[in-house]
């Protein structure tokens, strides 16, 4: 079972919050106290809350649920993509486009356009165009890939969001709330935990902390997918 210990979190600097003057009072229950002008997060709270979140992620993945990893901060972009690919899930790591969930119909059309352009680039269509037209289509394809590449195979709305930085990704959180999609999020001391179903109080800036959250989440999803595959195999075996 995917689990994270207190030692793991201390080594990754999960307990370092923001400067005290930037705090959100709603985070008070999860703060141990100030140290040198910085709020220290109470890991006695974070450890069980994160492990509870991991159990739920495993359950969702075990029911063949789709997990969308969201993290567009510079410190998170590469790690978010790597974690999602590691567990064969989906990601948004460049910029959250307003309506990405709530206006899925339009997003689906853009994904269709992206796939169409990819086909054109591979089947020789681009070679038949003028240099200028080929360049314009290549740029359009690259722009769409940057925004939608991580969700182009999602095939519908996700069953959960795993968010690095609830504050930074507040639009994504709000859209998920509107659609009743559960939100798992790292919530720092300057953030608002409202709208987050599974609050994980922790540092949302440090690369090592971000890596810890994502590695554990990916492991939890893989565990769920494995359980799902084993259940299917047993079902087929019994049917035979």
From Swiss-Prot:
The UniProt entry's GO biological process terms, in alphabetical order, are: translation
The source's domain of life comes to Bacteria
What keywords does the record list, in alphabetical order?
A: Ribonucleoprotein, Ribosomal protein
Question: GO CC annotations?
Answer: cytosolic small ribosomal subunit
The record's GO molecular-function terms, alphabetically, read:
structural constituent of ribosome
A single Pfam family, by name? Ribosomal_S2
- Similarity comment: family membership: Belongs to the universal ribosomal protein uS2 family.
Q: Which HAMAP family match?
A: Ribosomal_uS2_B (MF_00291_B)
Put simply, this protein is called Small ribosomal subunit protein uS2
Q: Which organism is it from?
A: Pasteurella multocida (strain Pm70)
- Give the organism's phylogenetic lineage: Bacteria, Pseudomonadati, Pseudomonadota, Gammaproteobacteria, Pasteurellales
